[in-house]
Structure formats: structure tokens, C-alpha cells
From Swiss-Prot:
Microtubule inner protein component of sperm flagellar doublet microtubules. Interacts with BRCA2. Interacts with the CCT chaperonin complex. Interacts with HSP70. Interacts with AK8. Interacts with CFAP45. Interacts with DNAI1. Interacts with IQDC. The keyword Transcription does not apply. The keyword Protein transport does not apply. It comes from Sus scrofa (Pig). It is found in: Cytoplasm; Cytoplasm, Cytoskeleton, Cilium axoneme; Cytoplasm, Cytoskeleton, Flagellum axoneme. This is Cilia- and flagella-associated protein 52. Keywords: Cell projection, Cilium, Cytoplasm, Cytoskeleton, Flagellum, Phosphoprotein, Repeat, WD repeat. The lineage of its organism: Eukaryota, Metazoa, Chordata, Craniata, Vertebrata. WD repeats lie at residues 62-106, 109-150, 156-195, 203-242, 288-327, 330-369, 372-411, 415-454, 459-498, 500-539, 543-582, 585-620.
Amino acid sequence: MENQIQPKAEVAKLELEAVIGFNGHVPTGLKCHPDQEHLIYPLGCTILIQAIKTQEQNFLHGHSNNVSCVTISKSGVYIASGQVTFMGFKADIILWDYKKRELMARLSLHKGKIEALAFSPNDLYLVSLGGPDDGSVVVWSIAKTEAICGSPAAGLNVGNATSVVFSQCHDEMFVTAGNGTIRVWELDLPNRKIWPTECQTGQMKRIVMSISMASDDSFFYLGTTTGDILKMNPRTKLLADTGPAKDKFSLGVSAIKCLKTGGLLVGSGAGLLVFCRSPSYKPIKKIQLQGGITSISLRGEGHQFFVGTEESHIYRVNFTDFKETLVTTCHFEAVEDVVFPFGTAELFATCAKKDIRVWHTLSNRELLRITVPNMTCHGIDFMRDGKSLISAWDDGKIRAFAPETGRLMYVISNAHRIGVTAVATTSDCTRVISGGGEGEVRVWQIGHQTQKLEEALKEHKSSVSCIRVKKNNEECVTASTDGTCIIWDLVRLRRNQMILANTLFQCVCYHPEEFQIITSGTDRKIAYWEVFDGSGIRELDGSLSGSINGMDITPEGVHFVTGGNDHLVKVWDYNEGEVTHVGVGHSGNITRVRISPGNEYIVSVSADGAILRWKYPFPS
């Protein structure tokens, strides 16, 4: 009997064209490759290799969970990356071949999390530190891709080791440091052992955040949470000096880099980038950047270097004039919505906590940023004429901005009691329909200078998650997390039809012929409904695991796209109800997905701040 079951047809893969995103929270996650042409950085469970000049991107897929550390060998031949996993499970280290852009080996020994990685100067060994639940340090042979030896990383009476650096000249020495522990290790290869020596810092108790070795191994420098720098001698294991005595770096020294000339580049948790020298450590040059600095990576000898911050900014800094240029930026919080202007795929807007951003589609460049401090924007929509961008905020206000300049045009205060959760506009640009956290749907008349409430439609019992308007502006449908979808008559301003289901509806779409709607939500089902009488037509299993949060349909109504908590973008055939293509690449829950006008791209956004652009799989 079992032999007769036909295997399912192979589902095609969506082609990933570009990623806008950078996880700035990974310590020393941003790396400049020794070929000086590429930046390497993590985003969720993928690693991006981006050409500095052409912005061309390659992706390394292989981790099953978020990447927690990245390192590159001195020769540039290998990349190693570690990941986080669940408590008690093995966390993988992956060794990549840089030239071929492919996985070479999976090194699995640590549990829970890989804290830090470092290559030896001649590419012989890789050293790895396990996370707080693991607490061990392991040396791996790169030639044999197997572990040589391991040991507990820190003593019994001190905290965890969190950073590691290899000697610049010898393959047999490395340093680990962390909470109250600084150790110099010697590798004894014939006996397959590593011998630690605890470094003496006297009365000073420090938690080390960052570490860097001088190019001749004469000293290594440690940045601490206290905001000062320790200079240690690896031969004598003694403290050489510390500083600055006054004006310590605010929020700790989160990144540190030795230069060949003998100076230090120091990045603080408050976003201050400083060039200083031992023993005074007084700033010689300094600039203020946005977000705490987590990575400093030199291009070549350090005539130019790249800086990564927690707010997902990547800066390029020339050493001589010490001026910063923003290279890449993206959202560092969950992206709530994405929308294209009517009739053009050249640009699109996204919104998240604190800001709305407008992006140029082909170059991935940020064209405009509109910031409203300490507020979250839940939804956006362009007016059909392109003169205003309407946004829904959690402080209960609807704000309209000019899309070219970001100028605030008007605010509708107290639009909803518990924040505005969804917003839509009519094609004649005279009305805005908004939904709130308390479940009200409100219709606003927008004049030249006035914004007037036409009607408050009170039916939903919980927050409104999605609003779609019919082409003739006489009807709209609202989806709510109370398990109802309501079709409203926008002429009589009354309810036409109500759809009930045992789910929290997250998204709804009109079929272009507007006699059917499709809905989806937390029950993972995609349901088709008749608009006329609200009866169910069919139901599909949209996902095997997790809610479906975003949905969009093509203007022809032949295909539609969904995305949700299974991190997959799926393209469906509307009539057949079959998945035709699947896009793998997100590492956070997908919150919204859109098909661009003209069916060129699919843009999906996720809870980890990433924006992914996919090639639309069918000829438009």
C-alpha cells in the first residue's frame, strides 16, 4: 500500500535578489575580508558576503538558528561561524570555504551557544568558546576538521569567558577573557592538552567586553564594562598599564582594535569612536556614531576601517580625516509593515519601532528616514496620488508625512484609544480608514486643511490587524484578532457581512475580481470566502508550524504570496491551491509580504529587522 503513494512534486525555490539587514548585536560580527573587497556580517541564521564597491551579495546558508559569532582566517581562505541553539542541544560551528562560498565542515561539541571564535595565524587551528551553559574552550584542527583538545574556559570562582584572541605570530598561544578572568593558553600538541596561566591584575576586578592583540604579540589590550582599557604582557602575564584614569568610556569599551602604528581604535557602548594611545588613553581623534559600537574591522593596514553599531548601521571611516560615511543601514527592531506606492516598484516604505524608512528598490539604499522617538508604527499606506504617506502609531495618532521630504503634514490625535493598529486609504484620496487596538474601525474625511471623523464602526471586540479597500471605494474588509472579518459598506457606513472563524485573523486580501476574499491567521489555514454572503468556499493548510502573518495577491489574481512564523515565503496558485515556490532566507518571523506593482519582486519583512527582496517567479 505504502509503495503506491506518489511522491509530491518538487517545489521550486524563490530566487533571493537582495537582503537589507545587519545584526549589529553580534560582538565583532562585522568583518572586512583580507582581500579588502568584501564585508562579511551576520543576519539571523545567514551570513552575508557583500562586495564593498558593487554591493553585490552572496549568502552562506547552513545554520539552524541565529549566528552568534563570525571570524575570518588571516589568509582569508576560511570563514568560521557559530550559532545559538536551545538549552541542552549541541550548537554547531560551521567552517566555510570563502572562495567557493560553501560549507566545508560542521564542528559540533559545544552546547547552547558559541560565544567566540578565533583562527591561528597560519590557519592551523581554530579555537572556540562555549556559552554560559557550556563553559569550555576547544581547539580544533582545520586540516582534519576535528577537535584536538578541550578544557573548562575559566576557573571555578570566576565568571564566564566571553572573548578570545589568537597570537599574531605563534600558532600555539591564545588568550581568553571574560568576567573576572584573563587567561593565556599554551597548546601542547604532542600531549593534546592546553595549559592555562591566569593573568594577574592585582586589586582590579573587571569584566572584559573586547580584546585585541598587537601585531608583534608584545601586548594585548582588553576593553572592560567599566569603560577603561587594560594593557597586558602575554609573556610575563602581568598588567602593563591601564587607562584612562578620568573620563572613562561611557557604557563600556565594547570594541577595540590595535593598529600597526601603535595606536588603538576604541568603540564605546554609547557610540563614541576614539583613536588613542597607551599609556594615557586620552582621545586624539573622536567621532560620535548612532548606537553602541560592536565591531571595528580594518581594511588592510587600517588606512580605512568599518564600524558596526547595535542600531544596525555600518560606517566606513578614513583614518586620516576621521570622518564617517554610512555604508549600510536597516531596521534594528521588528519591521511591522511594507508598502509600495501605487503603480511603481522603484521604491517602497517600511515601518518599525521609532521610524518609517523609504528605500530605493534596486540599490537597497535608504532614501528617507522619518523618526518619531519612543513610538512604534504599526502600519503605513501611500495615498494614491503619492503626495502623502499615512502611518498608524501606537500612541493613538495617525500621522501623515510628505514622502519626498519626510515633513509632517498633519496629525489626527486620539484616533483610537489603544493605539492605531492598521490603516488604509481610498483611491480617490479623500478618505482614510483606520483600525485600533480596541477594535473600532474609523472612517476619516481628509480635506485640504481638515481631517474629520465620518463614522466610528464598532463591531470588533479586539484589535484590527488588516484593512483592505475595494477598487470602487464603496466597500472595505477588516480582519481582527477577535476571530472575525467584517465587510463594511463605506456608503451607508454599516456592516454588510461578517465572517467568523476560530482563529486570530492576521491578514486579508480581496481577489481582484472582488467577489471573493482570502484570509489567514494563527490557525495556519488559508480560507477563501464569498463576499456576497460570507460563506466559506475552501480552506488550505498554509503552514505546518506557526501563524501566517502576511499575504498579498497579484493584480491578475492568478497567484498569491504568504509569509509567517515558519520563516518561509510561499507563492501559491490561487485556483489550484498549491504551493508553486518557496523562499528560504528569513530567520525571524515574517510580519508582512508584498508583491511589487508590475509583478517584478516580492518584498518580505521580518521580526529580526530584515527586509528581503525576491525575484517574482513568473513572467510578468
